[in-house]
Amino acid sequence: MPKRVLQGVVVSDKNDKTVVVKVERRYSHPLLQKTVRQSKKYKAHDENNQFKVGDFVSIQESAPISKDKRWVVLTSEAAG
């Protein structure tokens, strides 16, 4: 089964070798007939501490690295 890849924005880089990535998804609400934005934060492994707050990154699912980390940062995307 392929590993999931998500895109999001780094919102915290205070932990060693860890960044917190906020991933936003949009969906149509069945009753309100509106587009709703929902976000979720994922802790992702950043081996070299190279990503900073505000960077747009791709994260990939991985085997558990710690209690909360199950994602690895792949690449930094051009924000835009």
UniProtKB/Swiss-Prot annotation:
Gene Ontology molecular functions: rRNA binding; structural constituent of ribosome
Gene Ontology BP terms: translation
Alphabetized UniProt keyword annotations: Ribonucleoprotein, Ribosomal protein, RNA-binding, rRNA-binding
Pfam families found in the cross-reference section: Ribosomal_S17
CDD domains cross-referenced by the UniProt entry: Ribosomal_uS17
Record carries keyword Ribosomal protein: yes
Taxonomic superkingdom: Bacteria
Signal peptide: none
Keyword Ribosomal protein: yes
GO cellular component: cytosolic small ribosomal subunit
Function: One of the primary rRNA binding proteins, it binds specifically to the 5'-end of 16S ribosomal RNA.
Record's subunit section: Part of the 30S ribosomal subunit.
Protein family per UniProt: Belongs to the universal ribosomal protein uS17 family.
Official protein name in the record: Small ribosomal subunit protein uS17
Designated gene of the protein: rpsQ
